[in-house]
Regions:
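A general structural signal for well-ordered secondary-structure junctions
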Residues: 32-33, 60, 144
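Conserved GNAT-fold acetyl-CoA-binding loop/helix
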Residues: 31-49
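Juxtamembrane/interface motifs at transmembrane-helix termini
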Residues: 42-45, 54-55, 92-93
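An amphipathic alpha-helix signature
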Residues: 17-24, 44, 48, 52
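Short helix-loop boundary/capping segments at the starts of domains
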Residues: 29-32, 56
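Short, polar/charged, Gly/Pro-enriched helix-capping and turn/loop motifs at alpha-helix termini
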Residues: 37, 61-62, 121
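Acyl-donor (CoA/ACP) binding surface of acyl/acetyltransferases
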Residues: 1-22, 27-29, 67-181
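A short helix-loop-beta-strand connector motif used in the catalytic cores of GNAT acetyltransferases and
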Residues: 51-63, 72
Length: 181
């Protein structure tokens, strides 16, 4: 099982049990939780159960490291090796990196990992309709909208798909700029 992947100036380190409390604190912060489908407070016990469930080859959760700092979390989960698909996700906790090229570096590294290392053919993203930043970000990456499901708060969960070839086309356009820095 791969524990570290570096590309585009970021390093993705597989989430380990000693880091789950940091991730829980990030995840419980309203600046992060308000964009998540599950918005309830996460207890330490809930976090331990979650980690036990996702610590396997069907889920890769990575701490994002940029310039020797842990700045967020990215993942591919629910990998279906039969259909060659998985669901991607990202959150950058450190505000100073939000409106920079760093989220692109992270998602390019994750998608390269998924398409090149895991040999997936497509990625899915579920995004809450009030998360305009994530919607625009995913559209720029080449994701295409599929459908939506409304939750009890009247916020819709939107589904987007990214095919491998569409991703590489978009990535190559952006990567030329990223690699010059």
């Amino acid at each position: 099982m791969i524990t570290e992947f570096s590309k585009y100036g970021v390093t993705l380190r597989r989430l380990t049990e000693d880091k789950i409390e940091m991730v829980r604190n990030w995840r419980n912060d309203p600046k992060i939780s308000r964009f998540m489908d599950f918005r309830d407070f996460i207890t330490p016990e809930m976090q331990k159960k979650w980690f036990a469930k996702i610590d396997n080859e069907n889920n890769y959760y990575f701490i994002v490291n940029y310039k020797d700092r842990e700045i967020g979390l990215t993942n591919v989960r629910d990998i279906d090796y039969g259909n060659l698909s998985g669901e991607g996700g990202i959150f950058i906790y450190e505000d100073e990196f939000l409106n920079t090229d760093v989220p692109y570096r992270v998602i390019f590294a994750l998608n390269d990992f998924c398409f090149d290392e895991l040999k997936l053919e497509k990625m899915v993203a579920h995004i809450m309709s009030d998360n305009k930043r994530a919607i625009n970000f995913n559209l720029l990456l080449g994701y295409k909208a599929e459908n939506s499901v409304q939750n009890e708060d009247t916020v819709k969960k939107l589904t987007y798909w990214l095919e491998k070839n569409d991703y590489f086309r978009q990535r190559d356009r952006f990567a030329r700029v990223l690699l010059k820095r």
